[in-house]
Design a protein with these regions (language model features):
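Sec-dependent N-terminal signal peptides
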Residues: 4-15
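Low-complexity, intrinsically disordered terminal/linker segments enriched in charged
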Residues: 11, 129-132, 136-160
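Short, low-complexity N-terminal intrinsically disordered segments enriched in polar/charged residues
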Residues: 14-46, 155-160
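A solvent-exposed, acidic/Ser-Thr-rich amphipathic alpha-helical stretch
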Residues: 21-22, 39-94, 118
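Generic short beta-strand segments
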Residues: 50, 103-110
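Hydrophobic/aromatic beta-strand elements that line small-molecule binding cavities or substrate pockets
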Residues: 73, 86-92, 105-107, 123-129, ...
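A short, structured loop/turn motif at beta-sheet edges
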Residues: 91-100, 128-135
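Sequence/structural signature of outer-membrane beta-barrel proteins
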Residues: 108-112, 146-147
């Protein structure tokens, strides 16, 4: 127990970030590096401690996630495996401590049901909260891209 608090304290100190878009982009990239490496301590740091809302790319559901504890992070993230890279990252500050991120993920993904997608592509939207000296992931939505589509920057809506 004491080891966990010490580890979380050290991790929090090392991962603390300024409240700006540049720091959020670095946090987003570190989060996905941690996901790919199954670095549960870092993943736990980036999870919002008030819980989260997740939109699944494999089903048509939104899920309400309770506030995480370290065991729940290990339980979930040990069931999925990823080797994905975020691209075309766009960050929009919504209020003083709330940010929207829009980006694409591409690579390989193993779902919790065991299914593997070696050509995984998703359009992702997240809401990040700046709390406790760093960015925490509160809202996660993943929309699979059709195989023939490729990630691209956000463009103006066509008004034809």
């Amino acid at each position: 127990m004491i080891r966990s608090f010490l580890l979380i304290g050290l991790l929090s100190f090392n991962l603390s970030a300024e409240n700006n878009e540049k720091a959020l982009k670095q946090s987003l990239l570190k989060f996905w590096e941690a996901r790919n490496a199954q670095d549960f301590e870092t993943i736990f740091f980036y999870e919002s401690k008030i819980g989260a809302i997740t939109g699944s790319s494999s089903e048509n559901y939104f899920y309400e996630d309770p506030p995480p504890n370290f065991d729940s992070v290990i339980d979930y993230y040990s069931r999925v495996e990823s080797n994905v890279t975020p691209s075309n990252i766009r960050i929009i500050q919504l209020s003083e401590k709330v940010y929207l991120t829009l980006y694409y993920l591409a690579g390989s993904y193993k779902y919790s049901n065991g299914r593997v997608d070696d050509e995984y592509q998703a359009r992702v939207s997240n809401i990040w909260l700046y709390e406790d000296g760093g960015f925490k992931l509160y809202y996660k939505n993943f929309n699979k891209l059709k195989k023939e589509l490729k990630p691209m920057d956000i463009i103006a809506y066509p008004m034809d």
